[in-house]
């Protein structure tokens, strides 16, 4: 079925809507534990509302959910002990998508957001240089995020990952 841009984003909104999240199923997933394990700054490529919903189910609040274009809030949070910030660097489905959406989904959007000296690259590099990062659920395969991490890592910086056993 062919969709125009507006209809395409309407379908994406519907599919990834927070109302589609099954609370009982979410409580069985590892993501449900994130609010119990981390009470600080969270970075994600996910544009859905699962992390926010997990915080709600755990009766915890995030101070701010940011996405590209919120650099000032991101940089302010980096310097605080308990920012309770979720930064969704591929955008946020909850912001109401349209054909000029800020989520990163298409090849064209990836090229635009990840181009040299883009605000997104600047934001991620600052995060990687300012904080130790724990990667959860990331494959850590060679991709744009790993390329940024490699270019941003300074001698002596420490980052962590929890990976699936194969």
Protein language model features and the residues they cover:
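Conserved catalytic-core helix/loop/strand module for nucleotide-ribose chemistry
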Residues: 1-132, 136-166
